[in-house]
Structure formats: structure tokens, C-alpha cells
Curated annotation (Swiss-Prot):
Gene3D superfamilies (UniProt xref): Globins
UniProt organism field: Sphenodon punctatus (Tuatara)
SUPFAM superfamilies: Globin-like
Something else known: Sphenodon Hbs have properties not found in other reptiles: poor cooperativity, high affinity for oxygen, small Bohr and haldane effects, appreciable phosphate effects (those properties are also found in the Hbs of primitive urodele and caecilian amphibians).
DNA-binding recorded as keyword: no
Organism taxonomic ancestry: Eukaryota, Metazoa, Chordata, Craniata, Vertebrata
Protein name (record): Hemoglobin subunit beta-1
Length: 146
């Protein structure tokens, strides 16, 4: 994947405005609410019985922060995403057996949350850059499956 200087600048400048814990928790919470079949991977997280329970669940928030922190790592390694996510790809493929489509779904929800939080800062160019990032991360996570 080739990243332009403008894309790198947009990603970096907007990332600086992001509260990783807050946005990560919301994105993962939305994944579990909007796509309830993904809850099976989080059965040990306790109460996932409703949207309110999911979005208020401290384990969902903590794991969302962890997931979103990895998006930050991606920004540091844009030219080497496959290597950066190799161990996570192996974990999700070999141990957790996560369908790769779920990576794309989460990426789309990250974009939804960023748009809601960043308002006018999340321009069409910024959306395109984050979409490219989300797709690239999903592709890197799916690498072990091929």
C-alpha cells in the first residue's frame, strides 16, 4: 500500500485528537451491538444482554482501547503493516478462529465513531485516509488465513 504525504499528515493530525480508550470502547461496543454474532468471541466479558449493558461493560471498553491502540501502532508502521500485525493475525486465525469479515466490520465502525466525534475535522479526504487504513489493517490481520 502506498501512502501519500497528505494521507500520512491527515492520519497523524487527526489521531492526535483521538481519545483511544473512549473511541476504542465505543467502536467495539458498536460492533457487538450492530453485529451480535461477534459476541461469541467475547462470551467471558460478562453481561452482553443489551446495547446499554454492552456499551457500559468495562471489559468491552478495555478491550476496545487495546484494539484501538493497535490502530495507533499501524500509524507508526504504515509501510510494514503485515509484519506489524503478524502475531495478531496468527492469534485470530489459529486460536480464536475469527472470520476475517469481522475485521472489515470493525474498521467500518471505527470510521463511524471517528466521524461522529471529529465532526468537521473528519473531511472526505480524512475519511478516505482512515478507510484506507482500516482496510489495510483488516488485510494485514487476514494474512495468516491465506
Amino acid at each position: 500500500v502506498h501512502w501519500t504525504a497528505e494521507e500520512k499528515h491527515l492520519l497523524g493530525s487527526l489521531w492526535a485528537k483521538v481519545d483511544v480508550a473512549d473511541i476504542g470502547g465505543e467502536a467495539l461496543g458498536r460492533l457487538l451491538v450492530v453485529y451480535p454474532w461477534t459476541q461469541r468471541f467475547f462470551a467471558d466479558f460478562g453481561n452482553l444482554s443489551s446495547a446499554t449493558a454492552i456499551c457500559g461493560n468495562p471489559r468491552v471498553k478495555a478491550h476496545g482501547k487495546k484494539v484501538f491502540t493497535m490502530f495507533g501502532e499501524a500509524l507508526k508502521h504504515l509501510d510494514n503493516l503485515k509484519e506489524t500485525f503478524a502475531s495478531l493475525s496468527e492469534l485470530h486465525c489459529d486460536k480464536l478462529h475469527v472470520d476475517t469479515e469481522n475485521f472489515k466490520l470493525l474498521g467500518n465502525l471505527v470510521i463511524v465513531v471517528l466521524a461522529a466525534r471529529l465532526h468537521d475535522s473528519f473531511t472526505p479526504a480524512a475519511q478516505a485516509a482512515f478507510h484506507k487504513l482500516a482496510y489495510s489493517v483488516a488485510h494485514a490481520l487476514a494474512r495468516r488465513y491465506h
